[in-house]
């Protein structure tokens, strides 16, 4: 029994299968089929008056429903107000408010419902979305997928709401035999009975005026016997049905009905009261198609069940089973669902608990039509109001510039890449020569920006000539002991380093150090003091300064390493002081006599200071005139062993050349002469006895040996 009130939330100006109360104000009426529970108020006087006062109110239904409706004289007043719509034919109708003239366009499509002759479902498409009203329906599993008008673009239409027939939305009716199964069971029973003799008859006890036409026509076609009914006028325009029915009582299959429920002839079970012509008693059985009775059974039964001596029950349903309802709704997958019928013993809430999980979420934003496939979208991030500070904690969207650490560590080992703990304040020394190991220790505190990029294709490292390698001996040759599997360090390792030279390295210091590429040649200070407040250690304007030249590569020790063949540049590791020191003498060092011992271990606090040498440093160096002839000399301030505090270490800001261009090279001093060993004997003696060599008191230090 339908409990639908007639109006849909999406289109309230339309009334379906209900024609009383609020539905009297509707702009259009729709009738799904001609069963009485769907025709309330259809012939009421109030509706008749509404039709008399309106010229644009019509009733829309299928052609079969119109024929069945107009067979009754009670509904003849609708004859000029009924508009038929063909099945599966989308039709646009106008909903007009006669008082205001407002008009609304809606497209209506009728779909077969399988409930009874002429029964349809209504699919409405308009400005308020797509809505499906099923009325009473019986659709087998998978039948909805074969309805083309429920689909668009190869997928189910986006249906907002479904007003669903839930007559058997109860687990008790989980599985109902199909009509074909029921037909086969009834057919076998009827055939076995009527073939016994002409006096064996069957009465089909059908409660509805029509709806069992499917059963009648198939029995008549299979057995060749027409079915007796009370009236044929309702089927006069349905020749396919009319051919299998008759009003002649002299037939073996009857579907006639009693004039009243209580009237039944005591001596005859047939409502029509037919008897045999030769006074022979008729042998009659009754078959009652029903569904509710089978739903009340606790055990599985057959399609046909004998309930008495001559009575049978047949499972035959006009409505979809519980499993068929779920299959249909899960396939349509609407946003909302509304039950049209409340099953016996259930409530609306219990029915909704079953139906709601089969619907899709209204918050779903997935596009229904994706002809180009799934496209990429920007990710949506919902920020919590309590975590607003996270907006400023994220990394910048622009790429960061390269960072070069201030502090690098060089150990007196052969040049090979090796990890060095940061907590070692001093480096080991080699008695046979100054062996240096390049170690990259990234600073965790201070970095400087690398303002230039270095192209790998723009420069190549030079290799020392064979003659030079043979002359230096094993103590001076570069050892290629780097592990080739170790990751090649970045070229930033050799930029902006602070180099310290201990006193005993002066014994093995060469006259010049060859740079592997065109590095920064400006290692001399513009200030008269080496440890001035200015962080610069180089100047092109200092004409008296001694330079490290890459032009005299034959007189310098080439530093190379197998593991660093891909390095873009190398950095000079000797710091030079200015010749312009007040009261100090400069002494040139002989070529090839000494090798530098390099040390660099600068903490973050030391970087902030401009101190390179201890305050009590003394030095006896030769005068400036004695060193003018050297082609490529290294001028150093030899320092005492007292260490200055870490806070007073010079901030080395020597800028390394990353472009390998000859424009940055500084030639050696013109007309310079190499110093002879006799000039340096005084210095050697002081170094051998451990005496302090004082040049000037400064706030810088190089560690003693």
Swiss-Prot record:
Regarding how it is modified after translation, the entry says: Phosphorylation on undefined residues by PRKDC may stimulate endonucleolytic activity on 5' and 3' hairpins and overhangs. PRKDC must remain present, even after phosphorylation, for efficient hairpin opening. Also phosphorylated by ATM in response to ionizing radiation (IR) and by ATR in response to ultraviolet (UV) radiation.
Top class in the EC scheme: hydrolase
Query: What ranges does the record list as Low complexity composition bias?
Result: 546-559, 652-662
Feature: compositional bias, Acidic residues? 451-462
Compartment annotation: Nucleus
> Residues bearing Phosphothreonine?
380
Describe the function of this protein. Answer: Required for V(D)J recombination, the process by which exons encoding the antigen-binding domains of immunoglobulins and T-cell receptor proteins are assembled from individual V, (D), and J gene segments. V(D)J recombination is initiated by the lymphoid specific RAG endonuclease complex, which generates site specific DNA double strand breaks (DSBs). These DSBs present two types of DNA end structures: hairpin sealed coding ends and phosphorylated blunt signal ends.
What is the designated name of this protein? Answer: Protein artemis
Organism (species): Mus musculus (Mouse)
Taxonomic lineage per UniProt? Eukaryota, Metazoa, Chordata, Craniata, Vertebrata
């Amino acid at each position: 029994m339908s409990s639908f009130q007639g109006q849909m939330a999406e289109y309230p100006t339309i009334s379906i299968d209900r024609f009383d109360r609020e539905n009297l104000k509707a702009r259009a009426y729709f009738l799904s089929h001609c069963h009485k529970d769907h025709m309330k108020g259809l012939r009421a006087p109030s509706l008749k008056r509404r039709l008399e006062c309106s010229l644009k109110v019509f009733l829309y239904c299928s052609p079969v429903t119109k024929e069945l409706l107009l067979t009754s004289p009670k509904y003849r007043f609708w004859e000029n107000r009924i508009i038929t719509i063909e099945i599966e034919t989308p039709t646009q109708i106008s909903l007009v408010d006669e008082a205001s003239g407002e008009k609304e366009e809606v497209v209506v499509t009728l779909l077969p419902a399988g409930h009874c002759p002429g029964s349809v479902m209504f699919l409405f498409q308009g400005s308020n979305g797509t809505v499906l009203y099923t009325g009473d329906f019986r659709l087998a599993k998978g039948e909805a997928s074969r309805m083309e008008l429920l689909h668009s673009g190869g997928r189910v239409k986006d249906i907002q709401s479904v007003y669903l027939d839930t007559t058997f939305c109860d687990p008790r009716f989980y599985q109902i035999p199909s009509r074909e199964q029921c037909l086969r069971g009834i057919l076998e029973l009827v055939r076995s009975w009527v073939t016994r003799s002409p006096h064996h008859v069957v009465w089909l006890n059908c409660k509805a005026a029509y709806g069992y036409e499917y059963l009648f026509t198939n029995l008549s076609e299979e057995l060749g016997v027409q079915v007796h009914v009370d009236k044929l006028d309702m089927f006069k325009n349905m020749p396919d049905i009319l051919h299998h029915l008759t009003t002649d009582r002299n037939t073996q299959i009857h579907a006639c009905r009693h004039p009243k429920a209580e009237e039944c002839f005591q001596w005859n079970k047939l409502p029509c009261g037919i008897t045999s012509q030769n006074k022979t008693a008729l042998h009659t059985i009754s078959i009652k198609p029903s569904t509710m009775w089978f739903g009340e059974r606790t055990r599985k039964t057959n399609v046909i069940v004998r309930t008495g001596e001559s009575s049978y029950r047949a499972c035959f349903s006009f409505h979809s089973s519980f499993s068929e309802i779920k299959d249909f709704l899960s396939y349509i997958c609407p946003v909302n669902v509304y039950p049209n019928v409340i099953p016996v013993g259930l409530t609306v809430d219990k029915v909704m608990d079953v139906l709601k999980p089969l619907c899709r979420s209204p918050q779903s934003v997935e596009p229904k039509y994706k002809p180009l496939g799934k496209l990429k979208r920007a990710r949506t991030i919902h920020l919590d109001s309590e975590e607003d500070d996270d907006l400023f904690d994220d990394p910048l969207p622009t790429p960061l510039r390269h960072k070069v650490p201030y502090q690098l560590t060089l150990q007196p080992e052969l040049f090979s890449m090796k990890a060095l703990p940061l907590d070692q304040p001093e480096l080991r020394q080699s008695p046979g020569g100054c062996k240096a190991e390049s170690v990259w220790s990234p600073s965790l505190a201070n970095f400087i920006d690398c303002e230039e990029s270095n192209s790998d294709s723009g420069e190549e490292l030079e290799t020392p000539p064979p003659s030079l390698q043979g002359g230096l001996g094993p103590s001076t040759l570069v050892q290629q002991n780097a592990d080739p599997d170790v990751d090649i360090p970045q070229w930033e390792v050799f930029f902006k380093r602070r180099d310290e030279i201990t006193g005993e390295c002066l014994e093995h210091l060469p006259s010049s150090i060859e740079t592997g590429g065109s590095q920064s040649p400006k290692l001399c200070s513009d200030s008269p003091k080496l440890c001035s407040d200015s962080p610069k250690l180089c100047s092109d304007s200092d004409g008296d300064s001694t330079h490290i030249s890459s032009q005299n590569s034959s007189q310098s020790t080439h530093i190379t390493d197998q593991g660093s063949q891909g390095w873009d540049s190398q950095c000079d590791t000797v710091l030079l002081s200015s010749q312009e020191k007040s009261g100090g003498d400069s002494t040139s060092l002989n070529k090839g006599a000494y090798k530098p011992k390099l040390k660099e271990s600068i903490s973050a606090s030391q970087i902030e200071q401009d101190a390179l040498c201890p305050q009590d440093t003394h030095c006896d160096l030769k005068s400036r005139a004695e060193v003018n002839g050297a082609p490529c000399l290294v001028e150093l301030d030899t320092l005492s062993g007292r260490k200055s505090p870490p806070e007073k270490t010079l901030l080395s800001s020597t800028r390394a050349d990353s472009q390998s261009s000859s424009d940055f090279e500084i030639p050696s001093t013109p007309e310079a002469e190499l110093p002879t060993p006799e000039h340096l004997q005084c210095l050697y003696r002081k170094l051998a006895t451990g005496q302090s060599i004082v040049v000037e008191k400064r706030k810088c230090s190089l560690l003693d040996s």
